[in-house]
């Protein structure tokens, strides 16, 4: 699995709009390009940070090269309208191969070790 981390600063008062647009866009990207989904977080400094999961780097690269364009033009316009700042060149903050995955770990009933 391959994970890509993105961040954005959102214009004050546009947070709900951004989140709706992000959800809609993420669903479209998964449907069209084969992404596995994403989680959106809010940093203490106010930035929104997304961790997007992909089956592999090649699948992500094809989507990235295609600029992840999707048909929901309204969602895309909402997203762009809400953005105040992006990283230089709109580049991902991190691109990582997953080595160990305990994200779905049930801490109430942990698996038994061998």
Question: Where do the language-model regions lie?
Answer:
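Short, well-ordered beta-strand segments in beta-rich or mixed alpha/beta enzyme
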Residues: 2-9, 37-67, 108
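Short amphipathic
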Residues: 7, 94-100
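Short, surface-exposed ligand-recognition loops at beta-strand->loop->(often short) alpha-helix junctions
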Residues: 9-20
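Generic structural motif
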Residues: 11-13, 57, 101
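Polar low-complexity intrinsically disordered regions enriched in Ser/Thr and small residues
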Residues: 16, 28, 37-38, 107
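Short, low-complexity N-terminal intrinsically disordered segments enriched in polar/charged residues
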Residues: 16-17, 42, 111-114
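An amphipathic, aromatic/His-enriched active-site/gating alpha helix that lines ligand/cofactor pockets
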Residues: 24-36, 53-95, 111-113
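C-terminal/domain-terminus segments
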Residues: 101-114
């Amino acid at each position: 699995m391959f994970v890509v981390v993105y961040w954005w600063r959102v214009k004050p008062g546009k947070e709900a709009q951004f989140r709706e647009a992000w959800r809609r866009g993420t669903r479209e990207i998964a449907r069209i390009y084969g992404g596995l989904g994403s989680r959106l977080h809010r940093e203490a400094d106010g930035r929104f940070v997304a961790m997007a999961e992909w089956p592999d780097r090649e699948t992500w690269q094809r989507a990235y090269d295609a600029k992840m364009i999707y048909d929901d033009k309204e969602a895309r316009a909402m997203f762009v309208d809400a953005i105040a700042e992006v990283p230089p060149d709109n580049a991902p903050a991190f691109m990582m191969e997953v080595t160990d995955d305990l994200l779905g770990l049930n801490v109430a009933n942990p698996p038994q070790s061998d």
